[in-house]
Design a protein with these regions (language model features):
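Flexible helix-coil transition and linker loops at the boundaries of alpha-helical arrays
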Residues: 43-46, 79-93
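TPR/Sel1-like alpha-solenoid repeat signature
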Residues: 55-62, 74, 95-106, 118, ...
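Terminal, low-structured helical/coil segments at or just beyond the last alpha-helical repeat
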Residues: 3-19, 151, 158-179
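Long, contiguous interaction/recruitment modules in multidomain scaffold/adaptor proteins
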Residues: 1-49, 53, 60, 67
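Canonical positions in the second alpha-helix
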Residues: 44, 78, 121-122, 155-156
Length: 179
């Protein structure tokens, strides 16, 4: 009996260790891939002007690293680059993503008015962009504009009725607004 218990214990331990090793290995690969993209894009964009997509990708990496000041500069360069390029559907999509990313970077720096302005610009370009609507509602909440936040969350729920964040926040805001 004690022998079986030891085998079970060791099997569970080996399983947990295997899971931990695999998780760490996956994280290392993900980090290396991101760092490779980061260094490649950064060196290219310091030598020459880039495309909207390249500026957006590098700015997104800076945002993930929580380097929001650098991200804001790159998001702005992406928008400027888009003005100089011939607009097609892909560029328009990246412009929308860029405005949302710019809003996120401003939000992270607690510059809510600028965040709201950029989220609205993203929504002007793509009115059914659920992520930007969620972000806009969150910025309204931080500014204590509860009725606008509730309205934005309700728009999210019209577009995506299963959005858990919008459901939870809308319920909470309904209580605040009606109280």
């Amino acid at each position: 009996m004690d022998k079986n218990l030891a085998v079970i214990y060791l099997s569970i331990l080996v399983g947990l260790l295997s899971f931990a090793v695999i998780s760490v290995f996956r994280q290392i690969l993900k980090s290396r891939k991101q760092e490779g993209s980061f260094s490649k894009l950064r060196s290219k964009l310091t030598k020459e002007a880039g495309t909207v997509k390249e500026y957006y990708q590098l700015a997104s990496i800076y945002s993930q690293k929580k380097l929001f000041t650098q991200a804001i500069t790159l998001f702005q360069k992406a928008i400027k680059s888009a003005e100089e390029q011939e607009n097609d559907t892909e560029i328009e999509d990246y412009i929308t993503l860029t405005y949302n990313g710019l809003g996120y970077a401003y939000f992270a720096q607690e510059q809510y008015d600028l965040a709201i302005r950029n989220y609205k610009e993203a929504l002007k370009r793509q009115p059914e962009y659920v992520t930007a609507l969620n972000n806009l509602a969150h910025a309204y909440e931080r500014k204590k504009l509860n009725s606008q936040a509730l309205e934005s969350y309700e728009k999210v729920l019209e577009l995506d009725s299963k959005n858990a964040i919008a459901k939870r926040r809308a319920l909470s805001l309904r209580r605040l607004v009606t109280a």
